[in-house]
Amino acid sequence: MKKINQELIALFDKYGSDRRRALRENKKLSYLYALADLRENLLDWCQFDPEQQALQIGADAGALTGLLARRLSSVTVLDVSEENLEVVRRRFKTEPELAAKIRYVCADVETYAREAEKRGGTYGYVVLIGDLTAADRAGRAAQMTAAKQLLSAHGTLIAAASNWFGVKYMAGA
């Protein structure tokens, strides 16, 4: 298990949903990045249809999962690492109303899209925040194509990528 994931799980176990207290008592930039409510600013302005479901590609310590769960009927968190998914599970363990709306899937987006196509599963929102994991342009294009395939007919793809200027981060993500 990655050290940061172990540390975050320990914080969630100790502080539950009191992330502000966890941050006050544990001053580390990596904790701030993972736990700060400010990260929700990236999507806070979006007017979501509460009847829709979202697919969040990349667990990202659950930084945006809570906002999606509060605003939508359900959220599926897709990540290639079971360890990353466990961090999100622990984050919402003490918030049963949100935890009940979150589903976890350990897979890559391309495999998940192929499986979803067979069973007809699509989402009103697909959220891809900085999780383009392929090293080359063709691989990233394949990931975006797979994300698009997971959208319902009138669905919305929300994407924000890390960049040299840190604009994503200045926006709160």
Language model regions located:
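Conserved alpha-helix/loop element of class I SAM-dependent methyltransferases that forms part
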Residues: 33-52
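Conserved SAM-binding loop
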Residues: 88-89
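Conserved SAM/SAH-binding beta-strand->alpha-helix loop
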Residues: 81-83
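Conserved SAM-binding loop of SAM-dependent methyltransferases across substrates and taxa
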Residues: 61-72
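Conserved SAM-binding strand-loop segment of SAM-dependent methyltransferases
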Residues: 97-111
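A short glycine-rich, Lys/Arg-flanked "PGG" loop and its adjoining helix->strand segment in the class I
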Residues: 139-156
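Conserved class I S-adenosyl-L-methionine
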Residues: 50-60, 159-173
